[in-house]
Amino acid sequence: MSTTQKTDFSAMSRLSADIDLNAEGKAHGFVRVPHSVHRSAYGWIPIPIVRIKNGDGPNVLMQAGNHGDEWEGQIGLGNLIRALRPEDIRGRLVILPSANFPAAMEGRRTSPIDEGNLNRS
């Protein structure tokens, strides 16, 4: 599967990713979170995702940015993403550097869409 094809999570949820989470190597993309608005029932919110995979091994998820105004973790994971190469790991590392991307883009603690706080959901 190329990086332009989507990973389909439809059997489990309505989320989709535009990178193959099972492929070897390093890829950057977005998880698409469905979101309806008045102008379109088919909108989505992009959540940045990075996959680094090298052979068999443990699966690790790293996440930051539950609160958009807490930059330390987001910056730290951004630095890690730039520094890590597939040959540096064994297994699969999935990174969500800005889990609440709309809040991060606004520099706000909660989502500007619905005032939601991911730590209180």
Model-predicted regions and their roles:
Residues 1-121:
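Structured catalytic-domain cores with a bias toward divalent-metal coordination
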